[in-house]
């Protein structure tokens, strides 16, 4: 009888290597865990608060009121003829979604190190759940915005392009991916450089004032500043959002090309850094 030769098989459990780290099928298998993280985020965010989830609407309304006073009444910045409350609420809601993606995703490794060190699951599930949480908040705020939009539509003060609503869906998706890319880049770097968390908060605020959030792009006439605004990846989404729902805004193919290129590059860089850091971050956090 021939001797059976046994081969040694080594089974490795842990994160995949390099670009194979982004396994969409694996993430789909962990979809229940992702939703569990989403629920956890909401529970933690509104735990022991008097108004609870009502803060989802209160925060943008307070910001909108402040912008109406500061930029509309005192600074008297143009809103391209649009009602101030609609103009600022639109910018606040969309930018709030983007900034929450960056700020919350940037703490992925530092705030979840205890979970990561105890059990294996696709680490990318954590930042994705954060983006989904931000998206849910945005949708609630968008519902409020849409109700106000219908009020001003009945008055004849806005002219939405209803045929472009599908573009709005793609626009929000692109903003989420851009925020995810920026966030995971920062989260990967903060495993070694904790100071970045402080810098990011200031940087995101500075980025907001460098984007057409509280003012329209039409206000920027200086050639150099205009060029900077064009390559800003958040300019195209902001102006397109207003163009779809207000009928105003300056959008060009160059703006969208720049925005999509930046989104792709930052997301690719973020995923690459994330896949490298997740293997060793426990030793550095």
PLM regions and their residue ranges:
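Hydrophobic transmembrane alpha-helices and immediately adjacent juxtamembrane helices
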Residues: 1-285
């Amino acid at each position: 009888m021939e001797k059976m030769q046994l081969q040694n098989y080594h089974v490795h459990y842990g994160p995949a290597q390099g670009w194979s780290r982004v396994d969409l099928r694996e993430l789909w298998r962990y979809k229940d865990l992702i939703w569990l993280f989403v629920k956890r985020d909401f529970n933690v965010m509104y735990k022991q608060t008097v108004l609870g989830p009502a803060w989802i609407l209160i925060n943008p309304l307070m910001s909108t009121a402040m912008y109406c006073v500061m930029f509309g009444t005192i600074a008297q910045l143009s809103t391209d003829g649009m009602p101030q409350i609609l103009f600022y609420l639109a910018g606040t809601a969309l930018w709030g979604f983007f900034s929450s993606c960056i700020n919350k995703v940037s703490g992925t490794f530092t705030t979840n190190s205890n979970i990561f060190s105890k059990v294996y699951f696709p680490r990318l599930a954590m930042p994705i759940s954060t983006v989904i949480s931000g998206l849910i908040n945005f949708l609630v705020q968008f519902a409020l915005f849409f109700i106000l939009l219908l009020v001003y539509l009945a008055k004849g003060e806005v002219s939405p392009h209803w045929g472009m609503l599908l573009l709005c869906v793609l626009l929000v998706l692109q903003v989420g991916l851009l925020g995810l890319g920026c966030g995971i880049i920062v989260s990967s770097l903060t495993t070694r450089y904790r100071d970045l968390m402080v810098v990011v908060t200031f940087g995101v605020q500075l980025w907001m004032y460098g984007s057409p959030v509280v003012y329209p792009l039409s206000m920027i006439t200086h050639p150099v500043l205009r060029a900077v605004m064009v390559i800003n990846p958040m300019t195209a989404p902001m102006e397109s959002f207003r163009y779809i729902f207000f009928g105003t805004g300056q959008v060009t193919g160059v703006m969208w090309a720049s925005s999509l290129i930046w989104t792709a590059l930052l997301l690719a860089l973020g995923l690459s850094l994330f896949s490298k850091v997740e293997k060793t971050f426990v030793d550095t956090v």
